[in-house]
Swiss-Prot record:
Its main location: virion. This is Outer capsid protein VP4. The lineage of its organism: Viruses, Riboviria, Orthornavirae, Duplornaviricota, Resentoviricetes. Keywords: Capsid protein, Glycoprotein, Lipoprotein, Myristate, Outer capsid protein, T=13 icosahedral capsid protein, Viral penetration into host cytoplasm, Viral penetration via permeabilization of host membrane, Virion, Virus entry into host cell. Glycans are attached at residues 12, 311-312, 390, 453, 492. GO terms for biological process: symbiont entry into host cell via permeabilization of host membrane.
Length: 648
């Protein structure tokens, strides 16, 4: 059967010469980027005309209003947006005709009015903006256009779903080279595989005529030459070509997007201030309300000011009444780490003790005890507590609903907690005026015996998650600060201090800044590859100067080993991208030396601002080989279709 061609180029899906030849030169595309947000569509100004006189003045101008409502000016941006929307809808005209829905293509001029007048939001604005033969849209026309587009898009959405199902099954895009498959074999394959209710089987020619505008792999044939028709090209071929991956730099669009995002992040987040040696307002460092998790039993008080420790030579027990029963809370034996609530931030505290060992085989007291999170008030700092009399009050803020033995599961002979979370919301106002108050996860012991004399019942080895709800102030080294000197924070902490810092700590705020910088460097600069990059070269320059300075005054100065400097710089840059918080820690080679991060930030910023579309795209030959391997696999798939569904 030959193709039936008319002046509107209607093609038959089974026509002679139809072919399926995907190529990496162009990807499938035709869907327009339609931005119908208010910021794009308004305000554009109303139509004004003089009333009672032919002379336009502020006093004589009035908004034009008739039975169609007021008239808004259709500027170039609005016209382009509407045109793209209609372009997308009208592409489906073959199906609208076949299903007898719609009334022909939608034409924007049918919903607009061309006239002259003045355009503005006020009479004063309009007087300065005369328009001759401008395009306007009335209130009624806007509503009609909106309803028309919405009605058509309802049908298009369903058809698009069915077409997507059919075409993705055929895999019409490849990332390198070209491939081909017998078109009639593909038709037989699709007919067998597609669900019976897929509309592509009901309206094959109509869907085919839509698809050839969207998928470059589909090439309808000329009935005379039995070759692809020279007139048939996808409507989105410009975008398709620029979206396609090239052997040189991959996707130009993707490269451009990476570059643009990196530049915006560098500028918008003030990442160049990361090593400033002057005070910066805390507001420069955007705080994060992301939760952070800790195991308080293993945090030393010297590493985190919000951890305190009871470490009396003998244990202490204090009784309390909870839910009508009497229990004892025990501190010790040995060090017992608690939360200094006056150093804690407003937050939701969740102590997860799931899987924690329950040694009630050696301490039977625990089997009848209740896991709980309590607040302990003392008359002296907890480090100075020596007797139960020093404890003035104990409040249970969260407790399990059963005793420990009913919450346990045996794992390889060891009793452990089932999933159990002790959760409480903490607000600083609730402890105002209480100088010594501490949080502790522990057991409420109903009748302690000598078995507990040698077993510390603390549950602070559980995972404590602190989810901030309000960050009132910023702290550093336990002191409240209203400004941060980044240079003093850099390379000035142990890894334990970094890990145990609360969300309002300057360490965390600067760490968040470092993470953003590391993301920019990692996304836009080929740090992890063997390529010499701007991040590495920025560090090398500082290392070379440092080496020269170290040789000043020596009788036989040693010249720098430049290949070694490049390797050290590459390791430092890679280390920063993979774990940026290392820059906060003491003793990390190269990365924590003064000026290194400043050099890296400056070098990367310069490289990005002067970069090209290819920035951030490296190892192109390796990527090309990988893409070619995918094409080989797809061609093998197409060959199997041709063999299993021979075209007739």
């Amino acid at each position: 059967m030959g193709n039936v061609q008319t002046s509107v180029n209607t093609y038959n899906i089974t026509g002679d010469g139809n072919s399926f030849t995907p190529t990496s030169d162009m990807t499938s595309t035709a869907a327009p980027a339609i931005d119908l947000k208010p910021g794009v569509l308004n305000p554009t100004g109303k139509l004004w005309r003089p009333v009672g006189t032919s002379v336009a003045t502020i006093d004589s101008l009035a908004i034009v209003s008739d039975r169609f409502g007021q008239y808004s000016f259709v500027n170039e941006g609005m016209r382009e947006t509407f045109s793209k929307a209609l372009f997308d809808i009208n592409m489906w005209q073959p199906l609208f005709q076949a299903t007898k829905t719609g009334c022909g293509p939608i034409v924007l001029s049918s919903f607009t009015t061309t006239t002259s007048g003045y355009v503005g939001a006020t009479a004063g604005d309009a007087l300065d903006n005369p328009v001759t033969n401008g395009v306007f849209i009335s209130t009624v026309q806007v509503m009609n256009l909106q309803r028309t587009i919405a009605a058509r898009m309802r049908d298009v959405a369903l058809w698009q779903q069915h077409l997507d199902t059919a075409m993705t099954m055929l895999t019409p895009d490849i990332s390198a080279g070209s491939a081909s498959c017998n078109w009639k074999s593909l038709l037989a394959f699709a007919k067998d595989i597609l669900p019976l209710d897929n509309l592509c089987l009901t309206y094959p020619n109509e869907f085919y005529n839509v698809a050839i505008h969207r998928y470059p792999a589909l090439k309808p044939g000329n009935p005379d030459t039995k070759l692809p028709d020279a007139q048939a090209h996808p409507l989105g071929e410009v975008a398709g070509a620029f979206n396609a991956a090239t052997s040189e730099v991959g996707s130009l669009v993707g490269s451009s997007s990476t570059l643009s995002q990196a530049i915006s992040t560098m500028a918008g987040k003030d990442l160049d201030l990361i090593e400033a040696d002057t005070p910066l307002p805390v507001s420069v460092f955007t705080p994060s309300l992301a939760p952070r998790s800790y195991r308080p039993a293993f945090i030393k008080p010297e590493d985190a000011k919000w951890i305190a420790e009871f470490n009396n030579s003998s244990l202490i027990r204090k009784t309390l009444t909870y839910s009508g029963a009497t229990y004892a809370v025990q501190l010790g034996p040995g060090p017992t780490r608690v939360i200094d609530m006056n150093a804690m931030i407003d937050s939701v505290l969740t102590l997860d003790v799931s899987g924690t060992i329950l040694p009630y085989d050696t301490n039977p007291d625990l089997s009848t005890s209740v896991p709980a999170f309590v607040l302990i008030q003392t008359s002296v700092p907890i480090q100075q507590v020596t007797t139960a009399a020093n404890i003035t009050a104990i409040t249970v803020v969260s407790a399990a609903g059963a005793s420990a033995i009913n919450l346990a599961i045996n794992v390889r002979g060891q009793p452990r907690f089932n999933m159990l979370h002790l959760q409480a919301t903490f607000e600083r106002e609730t402890i105002t005026g209480i100088p010594y108050i501490y949080g502790l996860g522990t057991f409420l012991i109903p009748s302690p015996t000598s078995s507990s004399n040698f077993s510390n019942p603390t549950l602070m080895d559980g995972l404590l998650t602190v989810t901030p709800v309000l960050l009132r102030e910023t702290t550093y080294k336990g002191e409240v600060v209203d400004a941060i000197v980044p240079a003093t924070v850099m390379a000035n902490q142990t890894s334990e201090e970094v890990a145990s810092a609360l969300a309002n700590d300057a360490i965390v705020l600067v760490s968040n800044h470092l993470n953003k910088l590391a993301n920019v460097v990692g996304d836009a600069i080929p740090v992890a590859s063997k390529t010499d990059d701007s991040a590495t070269s920025a560090i090398v320059s500082r290392l070379a100067v440092q080496h020269k300075l170290s040789q000043v005054g020596q009788t036989s100065p040693t010249p720098p080993d430049y290949p070694l400097l490049w390797r050290r710089a590459k390791r430092a840059a890679s280390m920063f991208v993979s774990n940026p918080s290392l820059a906060l820690q003491v003793g990390i080679p190269v990365l924590t030396q003064s000026g290194m991060l400043s050099a890296l930030t400056s070098g990367v910023g310069t490289a990005l601002r002067t970069g090209s579309l290819g920035k951030g795209v490296t190892d192109a030959s390796e990527k090309l080989r990988a893409r070619q391997s995918l094409t080989v696999a797809k061609q093998a798939f197409f060959d199997q279709i041709g063999s299993l569904w021979p075209g007739k």
